[in-house]
Amino acid sequence: MGRKWANIVAKKTAKDGATSKVYAKFGVEIYAAAKQGEPDPESNSSLKFVIERAKQAQVPKHVIDKAIDKAKGGGDETFVQGRYEGFGPNGSMVIAETLTSNVNRTIANVRTTFHKNGGNIGAAGAVSYMFDNTGVIVFEGTDPDHIFEILLDAEVDVRDVTEEEGNIVVYTEPTDLHKGIAALKEAGITEFSTTELEMIPQSEVELSPEDLEIFEGLIDALEDDDDVQKVYHNVANL
């Protein structure tokens, strides 16, 4: 899965460059998690996980605290998760995951974004069957066999463990992501650069320069939408 991890890194790096967007989207995700349970990460595991991911993305503490304080203060916004699937040029596939306080607005915006950027939105399940929902854990290390043994002993359902450029990359069943993180922490590994659920394509396509330009415009437009939290695709050369 090495190449797949390389693509995830490339997408994260490109997205993380737009820091204000990243901060704002994590702020919404933290607020929503805090509103759904206690606004205390020690008693709300979902909130704790989002905060850990925000820290990995270098979201400042004041942004995290502001979102939690808003939830504590009785903010009345309710956010709903969504997923929209569609197609770009020449066999390219896209999944956009959303978190919104206005579903009608989000549906209209995502549909318009696809149509204006050479794509077509599909029905639920139109492309997601070609992606594997996967837990991804990344940390510094060079001994994947040792890490695999740790996870095996902890009865974590692991799909693969690889070493990529001085990093260990663990792929788990989505239901075992948190179990995998806990097992690694128990083994003394406490610093992670990524702990995410990712939709990883089962196969990839390469686009011509002309099609790639169109497709890149579609991805950029989706990622610029404030309601879109994550965008996944199957294009190898983006």
From Swiss-Prot:
Spell out the Pfam families in the cross-references: TACO1_YebC_N, Transcrip_reg
Write the record's keywords in alphabetical order, separated by commas: Cytoplasm, DNA-binding, Transcription, Transcription regulation
Q: Name one GO molecular function term.
A: DNA binding
Identify the SUPFAM superfamilies for this entry. YebC-like (SSF75625)
| Predominant location category | cytoplasm
Compartment(s) where it occurs, according to its Swiss-Prot or TrEMBL record: Cytoplasm
Say if the entry is tagged with keyword Signal: no
GO cellular component terms, A-Z:
cytosol
One GO BP on record is: regulation of DNA-templated transcription
Which PANTHER family would you find in this protein's record? TRANSLATIONAL ACTIVATOR OF CYTOCHROME C OXIDASE 1 (PTHR12532:SF0)
The record's comment on protein family reads:
Belongs to the TACO1 family. YeeN subfamily.
Q: What is this protein called?
A: Probable transcriptional regulatory protein YcdB
Give the species. Answer: Lactococcus lactis subsp. lactis (strain IL1403) (Streptococcus lactis)
